[in-house]
């Protein structure tokens, strides 16, 4: 059995990946809000709850973007 070495940690594009994830999540929120007008009251509540979780995820991703950008500035030390 061959020994596999783990891939080195490549964080060079983490900021860009996180920014894409934030943008995609914002688009998902907007699409969900558009569908709310056609949803039942129960579905509206579920959509609102999911969008709240999405907003929380965006806040966490933005904090991670700041951390990754700072790490990039410091040479990932």
Swiss-Prot record:
It comes from the Bacteria. The keyword Chaperone does not apply. Keywords: Sporulation. It is found in: Spore core. One of its GO terms (biological process) is asexual sporulation. Induction: Expressed only in the forespore compartment of sporulating cells. Belongs to the Tlp family. This is Small, acid-soluble spore protein Tlp. The lineage of its organism: Bacteria, Bacillati, Bacillota, Bacilli, Bacillales.
């Amino acid at each position: 059995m061959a020994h596999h070495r783990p891939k080195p940690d490549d964080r060079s594009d983490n900021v860009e990946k996180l920014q894409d994830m934030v943008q995609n999540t914002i688009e998902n929120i907007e699409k969900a809000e558009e569908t709310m007008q056609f949803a039942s009251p129960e579905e509206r509540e579920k959509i609102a709850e999911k969008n709240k979780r999405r907003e929380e995820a965006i806040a966490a991703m933005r904090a991670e973007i700041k951390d990754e950008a700072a790490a990039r500035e410091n040479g990932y030390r």
